[in-house]
Amino acid sequence: MNAQELRSKTPDQLRDQLVALKKEAFNLRFQQATGQLENTARMRAVRRDVARIKTVLNEMAASAAAN
C-alpha cells in the first residue's frame, strides 16, 4: 500500500483500515511473545502502514482546516 492509493480513499475508509491494522499489530505482538511468529518483517510493514495512514489523515485534516 502506498501513499497515492491511500490519498484516493475517504477518511472513513482510512479509519477502518487503521483499526484493522492495529488489530493485526496486536495479534502479531502476541504471536511474537509466544514464539509463533514466523514472518517478523510483517510487524515492520504493519507499523509503517499505520504511519502512512495517519500521515494521510493528518494531511486531509490540515487541508480541510486551511479551506
Curated annotation (Swiss-Prot):
Keywords: Ribonucleoprotein, Ribosomal protein
SUPFAM superfamilies membership: Ribosomal protein L29 (L29p) (SSF46561)
Keyword flag Nucleus: no
Record's GO cellular component terms: cytosolic large ribosomal subunit
CDD domains xref list: Ribosomal_L29_HIP (cd00427)
Top-level taxon of the source organism: Bacteria
InterPro entries, A to Z: Ribosomal_protein_uL29 (IPR050063), Ribosomal_uL29 (IPR001854), Ribosomal_uL29_CS (IPR018254), Ribosomal_uL29_sf (IPR036049)
Protein name: Large ribosomal subunit protein uL29
Source organism: Cereibacter sphaeroides (strain ATCC 17025 / ATH 2.4.3)
The encoding gene: rpmC
